[in-house]
From Swiss-Prot:
This is Inactive cap-specific mRNA (nucleoside-2'-O-)-methyltransferase 1B. It holds the Pfam family FtsJ. GO terms for molecular function: mRNA (nucleoside-2'-O-)-methyltransferase activity; nucleic acid binding. It comes from the Eukaryota. GO terms for biological process: 7-methylguanosine mRNA capping; methylation; mRNA processing. GO terms for cellular component: cytoplasm; nucleus. Residues 184-413 form the RrmJ-type SAM-dependent 2'-O-MTase domain. Transmembrane segments: none annotated. Residues 30-50 are annotated as: Disordered. It comes from Caenorhabditis briggsae. Residues 44-90 form the G-patch domain. PROSITE patterns: G_PATCH, SAM_MT_RRMJ.
Length: 846
């Protein structure tokens, strides 16, 4: 991150210095007091804590039968010296404290002017003005009145004679929105995003808020079970740039919930990197970090920008992200008043990156500070060219005495963005060239001042924005001064504003949890029992209208062993092998907590002509069925719905680059984790399609069959068939309505049930039906098979060569009929054709 540290209140920092170390010197950052390490779970409890536990105390709850007691320690009353005696009380009437906020969208640019500017930027770089650098801002009155600017700068200078401790404590007591803090998130950046998301009508997260169903994903009432109402929606992609430790991203992953979003992160590597291990509101496994070609996360490096653009394109199938957020700043210690001048290249590069990675119609949120210079205002103007609409706003969660504000850009226009992107890349390379030469020159303008001034409506709006914020900042600087002198003063509205704002932003009013949850949804059952092997008889029926082949779906397996149960907990991943659970290194198995899967751990195969080579990468974790996906219990859904959800889950976990970096400094290392993917599902009617993805090779006289999934290949070891309806039911075909139905000799009163009623009547088999075979289930299945009903919840069709006979991949693929009573592809197709023929006679109706 480019760390914010406020010396009253323009943000300053020291790059590559941790917030905690720097806090001792300049303790005024907009985020600094919220990023605190969680207590170690192994930390010994004090006697007082043990006594409180015996009384029934739990973190975040009050004592008492109904937990009605206070939750916070009683505040200590203090007074330092004689400060506060004889000082005047602050006049609250000078402030405007509200819960709701009104955002103002700037007037959209005229379409003719938009085209003219793009045409101009394509032709040449004459608008790029290079001249001697400027190090003062006092005379920048083109976009703000001289008096407003002077008053603000003078208000800042008053604090040069005050201690940092007094200023910080004054801010804590004076800012009416201070107690909002970071809520249950990593830091205050998350709450800024929550604040902005709500007041901009959810254009950041793109939540469908019509009937408030989105709140089912993140219930406001603690203890309410969350529901994934967006399971069927497309994956939401976002990028977080210059934004360590990651508050923006933690909010977005929390708001989208479950596995509905995938984030990309780009920030300075080092101590101020993303603190993914501190994410508690969501899983950091849905977030992929990247540091550019230079591996330093410098957003101003031209090569890094190009590599980030390429990565996002690869990771989003060439579409780009729906949303980009940027939150950059760097150290301007001692030069706070010219922060805008010193930050100009950072401004430029953050806006440039948005044009590189945001998709058509996508949105962009970026924090800025002062915008008084022609360079900054020119950037804002160019954003109007590239987006449908833009807005400038300072939210409640941005401390009122600093100059921070946000630009919100809605609806990227890709054609205009391409033109402006290339122009800004040329500007950035020019700035890089001047920097490398230690030149005293600088790029001072991006477009002529007279072009900007000719847009009278824009000029009016930018001046009004600057003057309103300058006045508000001046008022709160004066309030800080008053509170610093009178240490007995507190803003009386802080508590009420916190509660009301959280409610308005639809954020639960709760505390940040301390650590992971090892709980899981795993039910107890006997894991030792195995389902019968696949046979042709499972596709046969004595009832003419039955279509047993439609009762099954299958996936190919690439591992020699049968599929294995995998469980992700709060701090570990376990897989069931050889009769017991084994732990996998969680750095290599990136599976979020509260996840239960059935997986095929397969080695990827590379081919060179007829040669076969096993990939050196860790084996793939292929999902062949799913029970719980990061807390989303899909176990009772139909099999195909479970697999569709698992496909989205795997896409959210997908790493664009195979290697990731863990640790930093001399402890940093690159590792290659297991990739997670979802197996492709087929019906038996789709055997031809499945066959088209098979490759038959000979190696050392042995036939080997590979199957393709996307751009990967695996050795075909077996097929797993899953029955999609419960064991009691049989599937038939209705000639009259041309749809499938189910019936059961065990439930004759139920009659025949058409497909559109299966969900309501709970006909579909569950995950547990096809994975766990209890002794009772095994006995029932055996009895049914003895009576000719060969309905098996799941079964494995092994393709491995048989040591005693010639049965194996070659016979399975090429033999025209069953071989030694064992299934082949031709035999299955013949059985399907025979079954279809039996449904044709006109005298069979139900």
């Amino acid at each position: 991150m480019y760390v914010f540290v406020d010396r009253l209140s323009d943000s300053v920092s020291i790059p590559f210095v941790s917030k905690r170390a720097y806090r001792k010197r300049v303790n005024l950052d907009d985020d600094e007091d919220d990023f605190v390490d969680d207590p170690s779970p192994t930390e010994q409890k004090t006697k007082a804590e043990k006594k409180m536990e015996r009384m029934g105390y739990k973190a975040g709850e009050g004592l008492g039968k109904n937990k009605q007691g206070i939750q916070e320690p009683i505040a200590i009353s203090f007074r330092e010296g004689k400060a506060g005696l004889g000082h005047e009380q602050w006049d609250d009437s000078t402030e405007n404290k509200t819960v709701e906020e009104t955002v103002i969208w700037m007037t959209n640019i005229d379409e003719g002017i938009r085209r003219e500017i793009c045409d101009k930027l394509i032709k040449d770089d004459q608008w790029m003005v290079v001249r001697k650098e400027k190090k003062v801002i006092d005379d920048e009155t083109k976009f703000c009145s001289e008096k407003k600017l002077k008053d603000m700068l003078e208000a800042k200078n008053v604090f040069d004679s005050m201690s940092e401790k007094d200023i910080r404590e004054a801010r804590t007591r004076a800012n009416p929105y201070e107690t909002i803090g970071s809520a249950f998130f990593l830091n205050r950046s998350a709450m800024k995003t929550a604040n902005m998301d709500k007041i901009y009508d959810w254009i950041l997260s793109r939540e469908n808020t019509g009937n408030n169903s989105f709140l089912l994903k993140n219930p406001l009432q603690e203890g309410t079970t969350a529901e994934n109402v967006d399971r069927h929606e497309d994956l939401f992609y976002f990028a977080d740039v210059c934004a360590g430790p990651g508050g923006f991203s933690e909010y977005m992953l929390w708001r989208k919930a479950f596995y509905n979003a995938k984030g990309f992160g780009f920030t300075l590597a080092g101590k101020d990197d993303f603190k993914l291990q501190k994410f508690t509101a969501s899983s950091a496994y849905f977030f992929e970090t990247f540091y550019g070609t230079k591996k330093n996360g410098d957003v101003m490096d031209p090569e890094n920008i190009d590599s980030l653009e390429k990565l996002i394109s690869e990771g989003t199938d060439g579409q780009g992200v729906h949303l980009m957020m940027a939150d950059g700043a760097f150290s301007v210690q001692g030069q706070e008043n010219i922060q805008e001048i010193l930050s100009k290249r950072l401004y430029l590069c953050q806006l440039l990156v948005s044009l590189c990675i945001v998709r058509e119609g996508g949105n962009f949120l970026c924090n800025l500070f002062d915008i008084f210079t022609p360079f900054s205002v020119g950037l804002i103007y160019l954003m109007r060219v590239c987006y449908d609409s833009i807005s400038l706003h300072k939210p409640h969660t941005s401390r009122p005495a600093n100059s921070e504000r946000f630009v919100v850009c809605k609806g990227l226009r890709i054609e205009c963005a391409r033109v402006v992107k290339e122009y800004l890349k040329r500007v950035n390379r020019k700035l890089d060239e001047l920097k490398n030469k230690n030149s005293k020159d600088d790029v001072m303008e991006l477009m002529p001042l007279d072009v900007i001034k000719s847009d009278e409506q824009f000029m009016k709006e930018i001046i009004e924005h600057n003057e309103v914020l300058a006045h508000r900042q001046t008022v709160y600087l004066q309030k800080y001064k008053s509170f610093a002198k009178n240490q007995g003063q507190f803003d009386k509205d802080q508590g009420n504003l916190r509660d009301e704002c959280l409610k308005y932003w639809q954020v639960p009013n709760k505390q940040r949890p301390r650590g992971g949850d090892r709980g899981s949804h795993l039910r107890r059952g006997r894991m030792g029992n195995k389902f019968p092997e696949f046979s042709i008889s499972m596709l046969q029926s004595k009832i003419p209208l039955n279509i047993p082949y439609e009762e099954y779906r299958f996936v190919a397996l690439g591992a020699a062993s049968d599929p294995q149960l995998l469980i992700g907990t709060g701090d570990a991943v376990f897989i069931y092998r050889h009769g017991h659970f084994e732990q996998i290194d969680r750095d290599y198995a990136r599976i979020p907590e509260n996840t239960i899967l059935l997986v095929d751990c397969a080695e990827e195969v590379k081919t060179d002509g007829s040669k076969i080579r096993i990939s050196s990468d860790p084996h793939m974790i292929r999902i062949v069925d799913a029970a719980v996906l990061y807390g989303d219990n899909v176990s009772q859904l139909p099999y195909e719905a479970r697999m569709k959800a698992a496909q989205k889950f795997a896409l959210a976990l997908k790493l664009t680059k195979k290697t990731i970096q863990i640790g930093w400094g001399f402890r940093a290392k690159d590792i290659t984790p297991h990739q997670v993917c979802c197996a492709q599902t087929y019906s038996l009617k789709e055997l031809d399609e499945f066959q088209s993805n098979l490759i038959e090779l000979k190696q050392r006289g042995e036939v080997i069959v590979l199957f393709k999934e996307g751009d990967r290949q695996f050795k075909t070891q077996s097929l797993r068939l899953t029955r999609i309806i419960k064991q009691d039911w049989q599937m038939g075909w209705s000639k009259s309505q041309q749809v499938p139905y189910v019936h059961s000799p065990l439930h004759q009163k139920e009659g025949s049930i058409l497909e559109d009623q299966w969900k309501k009547r709970e006909i579909h088999s569950s995950f547990w039906d096809s994975v766990i075979l209890t002794n009772k289930d095994k006995q029932k299945m055996t009895e049914m098979m003895q009576h000719g009903h060969n309905a098996v919840p799941s079964t494995i069709w092994s393709w491995k060569p048989c040591m005693r006979t010639e049965y194996g991949p070659y016979k399975i693929m090429n033999h025209p009929e069953a071989f030694d009573g064992k299934p082949t592809i031709s035999a299955i197709k013949s059985q399907i054709a025979e079954t279809d023929l039996s449904t044709q006679p006109s005298n069979y109706f139900y």
